[in-house]
Swiss-Prot record:
SMART domains: Molybdop_Fe4S4 (SM00926). GO terms for biological process: cellular respiration; Mo-molybdopterin cofactor biosynthetic process; nitrate assimilation. The gene is napA. It comes from Escherichia coli O139:H28 (strain E24377A / ETEC). Mo-bis(molybdopterin guanine dinucleotide) binds at residues 83, 150, 175, 179, 212-219, 243-247, 262-264, 372, 376, 482, 508-509, 531, 558, 718-727, 802, 819. Catalytic subunit of the periplasmic nitrate reductase complex NapAB. Receives electrons from NapB and catalyzes the reduction of nitrate to nitrite. The keyword Transmembrane helix does not apply. This is Periplasmic nitrate reductase. Its cofactor is [4Fe-4S] cluster; Mo-bis(molybdopterin guanine dinucleotide). Component of the periplasmic nitrate reductase NapAB complex composed of NapA and NapB. The lineage of its organism: Bacteria, Pseudomonadati, Pseudomonadota, Gammaproteobacteria, Enterobacterales. [4Fe-4S] cluster binds at C46, C49, C53, C81. It comes from the Bacteria.
Length: 828
C-alpha cells in the first residue's frame, strides 16, 4: 500500500487517537503502523531544560528520525513543549563539527592562524604540551575547566576527578554557576542540604502558586501546563506572578505583580511581617523545627576588589550570621510595613495584601516557584533564604501541595553540577574542598594519596574570566557550554583573556559557537543520544538513557575526551614527590589508570551490555565505564540522605527521586512518613543541620550594583524565549524554531519608544558602560516591560547582549546578576 504524506499523517493520527481511546484501529492505520516498525524506539530525558520530560526517541538507519512525548513518563505524561518535538533536528545542523580544528599558520599552531583540520592525536599532542608546560612553570592554579549543567552525571564526575584529584586544581566550575549557584547556597544556609524537598506531584495538590521571577509559561511550559490544568479545573486555586515586566505567565495570574528591580527583597520581608502581625505563625512547627539568625549586611557585589563598590563595602563577601531572638526578628521585619513596601516596590497595596494573605492563610497550601529572577541577583542567596522564611514561619513545607521549589534551567544542573559537585568548592554529595574530612573521604575512596585534593577553593566562573585576562590562568578547557555568549561583560572581562597570546583555549562542542570561534582548539563533540547518559532534574529525579546512534565523523563524547586525555599524564608529572612517597605503588601510572581504569571502576564487564547495544566508550576500553563511574560516585551519597539506586534500576525506570532507600524513591523530604531519614515521632527533621532545625534569616533590602541614572536611564533585563534555549546553539539550527523567532528584539514600553522617536521594527543601538549592540524595537508581543525597563533575550549570536551586562555577582554564590544593569538607547 502506498500512501501520500497527507494520508500517512492522517492515518497515523487516527491510529494514535484510537490507541489512546482503547478503540479498534482502522486497517489503513494498521498499515501505517506496519511501515513504522522499522523505526526503533527507546526512552530518554529531553536534552533541554531542567524539567526532565521523558521522550521516546525513534532511530532508523543510524539516525534519530523522530521524537515524541513518553506517555509513561511521570513528569510530562506524553506531552512535549515546542522544543521537545524538534529534538532530532538539533543533532543534524549543516555546520555540525566532525573533526578537531586547530588555529594554524605554516603548518604549526598559531594564535592568529586559521582553523585547520587535525587528528585527535594531534589535538591531544598540543593540549598535552600546553597543560604540562603550564603545570611545570606555574603550577595547578594556571589551568582551568569550565563545564556544564548539560554534562551527563559521569562526564561531570570524570571531569571533577581529573582536575581535583589528577591535576590537583580546583579551577573547575560549571555554567550552572550562572543559574543555580544562589539556590545551592540558599539551600545550604537554610537547610544544610541542597535541592528541593518537594516534587512535581505537589502541583495537583496545591491551593496557590506564587511565581517569583519565573516565566514558567515559556521556560518550564510542561510544568506550566500542569499548573494551568490545576488552576482552571478548580475555582479555589490561586496563581500569583511577580516579575519586573509582564510576560506570558501573567495570562493565568489572579494577582499579577510588577515590581521595581531588586525590591523583591522588600516584598519578602513585608510578607514575613504580615504573617507575624496577623498571628499566622505555625507555633508548633516554628518552636520545634526553626532557629533564627541575623546575617551580615553590606557584603559588596562580587566585583574586582579595586571597584569602588567593593572598596565601600563593610563586609565584602561575608556569609557570617549570629543567633537572634524572635523579638529581635519581629522588630527587624516590622520595618517593612505595607506603606513602605508599596512605596519602594511600586506595587499597589491591595495586591501586596492579597499576596501576603496566601501565605498567612493556614488553610492554603502554597508552592513558591522561582528561577533566574531570584538566582541571577546580587542578593540571590538572600532572596532564596527569605522565601524559605515564609514557609518556615507558616509550616508550609515538606508536605504534599506546599513548599518552596527552586526550578532549574539545565537538564542536569542538579544531577551533575550540584550533586556530583563540579563547582570549584564542592565534592560529591554536598561535600566541600575546604573540609579536611570531606577531602579525606574522597581521597580514600579514590585510592589517591592524602592531601592530593587542594583545600583552597578554585576559581569560579567570573573569576576564571578575570584570571585569564590577568594572565594567571593560561590553559582553559570548556565543555558543553557557550560562555563567550552566555557570560557577562564580554568586552571587558572575557574576550581579552581568550585572545591573550599567553593563554590557550580549548572548546569542546558539537557546533561552531561564538565560544568555539574565539578558541584556539575546537574538539567535535557527541551529543545527547549519541552517547549513554544520565541527568538529574529539578525534583531530584535521576534519569538514564542508552546510546542510540553514533556521532558523525570523528565527534567524541565529553567522557571519551576526558578519559583518553588522562592517558597523556603520569603521576610523577602532576604530583609532587611528597604525595608519591605516600603511595609509591602509583609511580609510573597514568592518570587514566589511577582515576578511571581502577579495579573498582573497571569491574563491570562489557558483557553486561546487550550484544547490539551501542556504547562507544565502554567497547573501546573493554569495561562498562559509565556503570563503574556511577557506582563509585553513588557510594558517596548512600546512607547520607543522597541515596541513589543501583545503576541498572535506572535503565528500567522512568527516573527515580532520591533518596532512594530499599528501592523506594522519596517525594517529600524532611517529614515523617515521607522521608526514610525522619524517624517516627520526629515530625520534621532538617537533618542537613546538626540539630535538625532549619534557619530563618534576617536579611535586609540592599540596592542593585547598577541602576539607571540621567545618562543610562533604563533598566536592562536579559533572559530567554520559548522557542530558543540559552544561546541558541542547538535551537537556532532547527529551521522551524529559527523561523518562529529568527532574531532577538528589544522589548520596550510604547511610551519609552515614543519618547526616543522609536517605532516598532526600528533598529536601535543599546548602549551600556561596557559595550553596545544593535537590536530591533518591539513594542508589542509576549513581553510587556513597564516604563523604565527594557528586556532582551540572549539567544542571538548576532546580538551579543552580554556585551552590555555587568559582571556583578552575588558575593556568597558568585552568581551573576543578568537581570539588572543600566542602558541608554540611540536610534540607528
Amino acid at each position: 500500500m502506498k500512501l501520500s504524506r497527507r494520508s500517512f499523517m492522517k492515518a497515523n493520527a487516527v491510529a494514535a487517537a484510537a490507541a489512546a481511546a482503547g478503540l479498534s484501529v482502522p486497517g489503513v492505520a494498521r498499515a501505517v503502523v506496519g511501515q513504522q516498525e522499522a523505526i526503533k524506539w527507546d526512552k530518554a530525558p529531553c536534552r533541554f531544560c531542567g524539567t526532565g520530560c521523558g521522550v521516546l526517541v525513534g532511530t532508523q538507519q543510524g539516525r534519530v528520525v523522530a521524537c515524541q512525548g513518553d506517555p509513561d513518563a511521570p513528569v510530562n505524561r506524553g506531552l512535549n513543549c515546542i522544543k521537545g518535538y524538534f529534538l532530532p533536528k538539533i543533532m543534524y545542523g549543516k555546520d555540525r563539527l566532525t573533526q578537531p580544528l586547530l588555529r594554524m599558520k605554516n603548518g604549526k599552531y598559531d594564535k592568529e592562524g586559521e582553523f585547520t583540520p587535525i587528528t585527535w592525536d594531534q589535538a591531544f599532542d598540543v593540549m598535552e604540551e600546553k597543560f604540562k608546560t603550564a603545570l611545570k612553570e606555574k603550577g595547578p592554579e594556571s589551568i582551568g575547566m569550565f563545564g556544564s549543567g548539560q554534562w551527563t552525571i559521569w562526564e561531570g564526575y570524570a571531569a571533577s576527578k581529573l582536575f581535583k584529584a589528577g591535576f590537583r586544581s580546583n579551577n573547575i566550575d560549571p555554567n550552572a554557576r550562572h543559574c543555580m549557584a544562589s539556590a545551592v547556597v540558599g539551600f545550604m544556609r537554610t537547610f544544610g542540604m541542597d535541592e528541593p524537598m518537594g516534587c512535581y506531584d505537589d502541583i495537583e495538590q496545591a491551593d496557590a502558586f506564587v511565581l517569583w521571577g519565573a516565566n514558567m509559561a515559556e521556560m518550564h511550559p510542561i510544568l506550566w501546563s500542569r499548573i494551568t490544568n490545576r488552576r482552571l479545573s478548580n475555582q479555589n486555586v490561586t496563581v500569583a506572578v511577580l516579575s519586573t515586566y509582564q510576560h506570558r505567565s501573567f495570562e493565568l495570574a489572579d494577582n499579577g505583580i510588577i515590581f521595581t528591580p531588586q525590591s523583591d527583597l522588600v516584598i519578602l520581608n513585608y510578607i514575613a511581617n504580615y504573617i507575624i502581625q496577623n498571628n499566622a505563625i505555625n507555633q508548633d512547627f516554628f518552636s520545634k523545627h526553626v532557629n533564627l539568625r541575623k546575617g551580615a549586611t553590606d557584603i559588596g557585589y562580587g566585583l574586582r576588589p579595586t571597584h569602588p563598590l567593593e572598596k565601600a563595602a563593610k563586609n565584602p563577601g561575608s556569609d557570617a550570621s549570629e543567633p537572634m531572638s524572635f523579638e529581635d526578628y519581629k522588630a527587624f521585619v516590622a520595618e517593612y510595613t505595607l506603606e513602605k513596601t508599596a512605596e519602594m516596590t511600586g506595587v499597589p497595596k491591595d495586591q501586596l495584601e492579597q499576596l501576603a494573605q496566601l501565605y498567612a492563610d493556614p488553610n492554603k497550601k502554597v508552592i513558591s516557584y522561582w528561577t533566574m529572577g531570584f538566582n541571577q541577583h546580587t542578593r540571590g542567596v538572600w532572596a532564596n533564604n527569605l522565601v524559605y522564611n515564609l514557609h518556615l514561619l507558616t509550616g508550609k513545607i515538606s508536605q504534599p501541595g506546599c513548599g518552596p521549589f527552586s526550578l532549574t534551567g539545565q537538564p542536569s544542573a542538579c544531577g551533575t553540577a550540584r550533586e556530583v559537585g563540579t563547582f570549584a568548592h564542592r565534592l560529591p554529595a554536598d561535600m566541600v574542598v575546604t573540609n579536611e574530612k570531606h577531602r579525606d573521604i574522597c581521597e580514600k575512596k579514590w585510592n589517591i594519596p592524602s592531601d592530593t585534593i587542594p583545600a583552597k577553593i578554585g576559581l569560579h566562573a567570573v573569576a576564571q574570566d578575570r584570571a585569564l585576562k590577568d594572565g594567571k590562568l593560561n590553559v582553559y578547557w570548556t565543555m558543553c557550554t557557550n560562555n563567550m555568549q552566555a557570560g557577562p561583560n564580554i568586552n571587558e572581562e572575557r574576550m581579552p583573556g581568550w585572545r591573550d597570546p599567553r593563554n590557550f583555549i580549548i572548546v569542546s562542542d558539537p557546533y561552531p559557537t561564538v565560544s568555539a570561534l574565539a578558541a584556539d582548539l575546537i574538539l567535535p563533540t557527541a551529543m545527547w543520544v549519541e552517547k549513554e547518559g544520565a541527568y538529574g532534574n529539578a525534583e531530584r529525579r535521576t534519569q538514564f538513557w542508552r546510546q542510540q546512534v553514533q556521532a558523525p565523523g570523528e565527534a567524541k563524547s565529553d567522557l571519551w575526551q576526558l578519559v583518553q586525555f588522562s592517558r597523556r599524564f603520569k603521576t610523577e608529572e602532576v604530583w609532587p614527590e611528597e604525595l608519591l612517597a605516600k603511595k609509591p605503588e602509583l609511580r609510573g601510572k597514568t592518570l587514566y589508570e589511577v582515576l578511571y581504569a581502577t579495579p573498582e571502576v573497571s569491574k563491570y564487564p562489557v558483557s553486561e551490555l546487550a550484544e547490539d547495544q551501542l556504547n562507544d566508550e565502554s567497547r573501546e576500553l573493554g569495561f562498562y565505564l559509565q556503570k563503574g563511574l556511577f557506582e563509585e560516585y553513588a557510594w558517596f551519597g548512600r546512607g547520607h540522605g543522597h541515596d541513589l539506586a543501583p545503576f541498572d534500576d535506572y535503565h528500567k525506570a522512568r527516573g527515580l527521586r532520591w533518596p532512594v532507600v530499599n528501592g523506594k524513591e522519596t517525594q517529600w523530604r524532611y517529614s515523617e512518613g515521607n522521608d526514610p531519614y525522619v524517624k517516627a515521632g520526629e515530625g520534621y527533621k532538617f537533618y542537613g543541620k546538626p540539630d535538625g532545625k532549619a534557619v530563618i534569616f534576617a536579611l535586609p533590602f540592599e540596592p542593585a550594583a547598577e541602576a539607571p541614572d540621567e545618562e543610562y536611564d533604563l533598566w536592562l533585563s536579559t533572559g530567554r524565549v520559548l522557542e530558543h534555549w540559552h544561546t541558541g546553539s542547538m535551537t537556532r539550527r532547527v529551521p522551524e524554531l529559527h523561523r518562529a523567532f529568527p532574531e532577538a528584539v528589544l522589548f520596550i514600553h510604547p511610551l519609552d519608544a515614543k519618547a526616543r522617536d522609536l517605532r516598532r521594527g526600528d533598529k536601535v543601538k543599546v548602549v551600556s558602560r561596557r559595550g553596545e549592540v544593535i537590536s530591533i524595537v518591539e513594542t508589542r508581543g509576549r513581553n510587556r516591560p513597564p516604563q523604565g525597563l527594557v528586556y532582551m533575550p540572549f539567544f542571538d549570536a548576532a546580538q551579543l547582549v552580554n556585551k552590555l551586562t555587568l559582571d556583578a555577582t552575588d558575593p556568597l554564590s558568585k552568581e551573576t546578576d543578568f537581570k539588572k544593569c543600566a542602558v541608554k538607547l540611540e536610534k540607528v
